[in-house]
Amino acid sequence: MDVKISAILLACIIQYAVSSPIQVFYSGAKILAEEDAMAKEDILKAIEKADPGSVKTQDSMDILSQILEANKGIKLQTQEGDIIQKQGRSAINDARFLWPKSADGIVPVPYNLSYSYNADQLALFKKAIQEFEALTCVRFVPWTTEVNFLNIMSNGGCGSLIGKNGGAQRLELDANGCMNMGIIQHELNHALGFYHEQNRSDRDDYVIIHTENIIPDFLKMFEKYNTNNLGIEYDYASVMHYSRYHYSINGDITIEPKPDPNVPIGQRDGLSILDISKINKLYECNVCSNLLPYSNGMMISANYPSAYPNNANCVWLIRTPSGQVTLQFQAFDIQSSSGCVSDYIKIYDGPTKAFPVLVNRACGTGLIPLQIASTNQMLVEFVSDRAVTGTGFKATYGSIQCGGAFYSSPKTFTSPNYPGNYTTNTNCTWTITAPAGFKVSLRITDFELEIGASCRYDYLNIYNSTLGAVMGPYCGPIDFHSAIVSKSNSMMITMNSDFSKQYKGFSATYTFVR
């Protein structure tokens, strides 16, 4: 019941959005003219593929536990579990051990990857460094001829020196135990100059170290260092933080947050909000960036609902723990201009501007339709000039298990695993948006969902009017003899399944018609 009500409310929002005035210039700008071009310019493909970033080794462990497990029985000489020993350094307090900044404000960090990694691992490494690129002035770039670079190897274990040490600087990422999004970012953070969070000079104000529960040989791992804390608060959520049971001799906690002992520590998903802030502070990055790493939340422009500032150039990286990112605007007021050349929002299907564009430029006073990414990452860019401003925008983000957003025609899409059986507890959303003056013609060519009274188990709904009216729910084997045509230029399809029986699902094709 709750799912159905939520879907109806979402449909109402979407239908209101597409009926409001807005200038949106999608990457498929020729969509009105040529249907062949439309297919090539699809903004977002509804794909279901293995996302390298979502595959976690030893998933029940936090990052540091995985590192220690990977380092068992190897000859990598480390301190604190994964910091490769080199005498007499406190890099974060010494500018000599920071990577130099170029004239354009970028901090290039060359790296060389050994031949030990397979294609999936290389893709995962690239995904891990893309967050640094999106949110900081640090750029991990392939090594060419630079004297100082990171020499990344798979010789067993996970480990890094602190900061720039010169020459071919060793960084260990074992192919079998360390190729995890959070571990990669953790070791790269060491190479940028960061220690473990619980070794900060002010850590006693935030955690209690229970030395009585620590294996005696590992007490040194919990020493405090004379660190430069950059004026940034202690970060329990840091990718650099130990978990509460690290090096426990008796199964009792070794690190207890205070004053609230239940605060989560030792997360393994990746860089935290404050991790990003620390990098930008340490390297004096002149960037406007925001990380949104939660399952759901809100994204607003600066000063909203007051006018946003002139000469803004900001990005928001949405990184949900799983699924595909969804973004729904609730308010939108960006200075209007021909072609949205002055102030605009641009949305990318991935963590950097190198990824496919979902919305090329948007301005005006309407609402952008629901956006759905193909993975758990979406980048939003906002640019303003030095002249007129508006009140900005307000949007909510979340995630779905499957679905897509389509802007070109014709297109065929299916339920997950079709023609195989769909999975249990599926919750999918597809949105189709035609150009102004066009409608969506949907033809369901094959359909079989679990049958039940009032379709209460598995069902498909179609939302196709300006009032958000729903067609459905549909279930069982059905032969759809004719096409379903929307009453406006948009349509939304949702599919839900419960925990019991599964069937092959559906296949559907749509076109745009006048």
Curated annotation (Swiss-Prot):
<feature type="signal peptide">
    <location>
        <begin position="1"/>
        <end position="19"/>
    </location>
</feature>
<dbReference type="InterPro" id="IPR024079">
    <property type="entry name" value="MetalloPept_cat_dom_sf"/>
</dbReference>
<keyword id="KW-0862">Zinc</keyword>
<feature type="domain" description="Peptidase M12A">
    <location>
        <begin position="90"/>
        <end position="286"/>
    </location>
</feature>
<keyword id="KW-0479">Metal-binding</keyword>
<feature type="disulfide bond">
    <location>
        <begin position="340"/>
        <end position="363"/>
    </location>
</feature>
<dbReference type="GO" id="GO:0004222">
    <property type="term" value="F:metalloendopeptidase activity"/>
</dbReference>
<feature type="disulfide bond">
    <location>
        <begin position="288"/>
        <end position="314"/>
    </location>
</feature>
<feature type="binding site">
    <location>
        <position position="190"/>
    </location>
    <ligand>
        <name>Zn(2+)</name>
    </ligand>
</feature>
<dbReference type="InterPro" id="IPR035914">
    <property type="entry name" value="Sperma_CUB_dom_sf"/>
</dbReference>
<feature type="binding site">
    <location>
        <position position="196"/>
    </location>
    <ligand>
        <name>Zn(2+)</name>
    </ligand>
</feature>
<feature type="disulfide bond">
    <location>
        <begin position="402"/>
        <end position="428"/>
    </location>
</feature>
<feature type="disulfide bond">
    <location>
        <begin position="158"/>
        <end position="178"/>
    </location>
</feature>
<feature type="disulfide bond">
    <location>
        <begin position="455"/>
        <end position="475"/>
    </location>
</feature>
<dbReference type="InterPro" id="IPR000859">
    <property type="entry name" value="CUB_dom"/>
</dbReference>
<dbReference type="InterPro" id="IPR001506">
    <property type="entry name" value="Peptidase_M12A"/>
</dbReference>
<feature type="glycosylation site" description="N-linked (GlcNAc...) asparagine">
    <location>
        <position position="199"/>
    </location>
</feature>
<keyword id="KW-0325">Glycoprotein</keyword>
<keyword id="KW-0732">Signal</keyword>
<protein>
    <recommendedName>
        <fullName>Embryonic protein UVS.2</fullName>
        <ecNumber>3.4.24.-</ecNumber>
    </recommendedName>
</protein>
<feature type="domain" description="CUB 2">
    <location>
        <begin position="402"/>
        <end position="513"/>
    </location>
</feature>
<feature type="disulfide bond">
    <location>
        <begin position="137"/>
        <end position="285"/>
    </location>
</feature>
<feature type="glycosylation site" description="N-linked (GlcNAc...) asparagine">
    <location>
        <position position="112"/>
    </location>
</feature>
<dbReference type="InterPro" id="IPR034039">
    <property type="entry name" value="ZnMP_hatching_enz"/>
</dbReference>
<dbReference type="Pfam" id="PF00431">
    <property type="entry name" value="CUB"/>
</dbReference>
<keyword id="KW-0482">Metalloprotease</keyword>
<feature type="domain" description="CUB 1">
    <location>
        <begin position="288"/>
        <end position="400"/>
    </location>
</feature>
<dbReference type="GO" id="GO:0008270">
    <property type="term" value="F:zinc ion binding"/>
</dbReference>
<feature type="glycosylation site" description="N-linked (GlcNAc...) asparagine">
    <location>
        <position position="421"/>
    </location>
</feature>
<dbReference type="InterPro" id="IPR017370">
    <property type="entry name" value="Hatching_enzyme_Uvs2-like"/>
</dbReference>
<keyword id="KW-1015">Disulfide bond</keyword>
<keyword id="KW-0677">Repeat</keyword>
<feature type="glycosylation site" description="N-linked (GlcNAc...) asparagine">
    <location>
        <position position="427"/>
    </location>
</feature>
<feature type="active site">
    <location>
        <position position="187"/>
    </location>
</feature>
<feature type="binding site">
    <location>
        <position position="186"/>
    </location>
    <ligand>
        <name>Zn(2+)</name>
    </ligand>
</feature>
<dbReference type="Pfam" id="PF01400">
    <property type="entry name" value="Astacin"/>
</dbReference>
<dbReference type="GO" id="GO:0006508">
    <property type="term" value="P:proteolysis"/>
</dbReference>
<dbReference type="InterPro" id="IPR006026">
    <property type="entry name" value="Peptidase_Metallo"/>
</dbReference>
<keyword id="KW-0645">Protease</keyword>
<keyword id="KW-0378">Hydrolase</keyword>
<feature type="glycosylation site" description="N-linked (GlcNAc...) asparagine">
    <location>
        <position position="464"/>
    </location>
</feature>
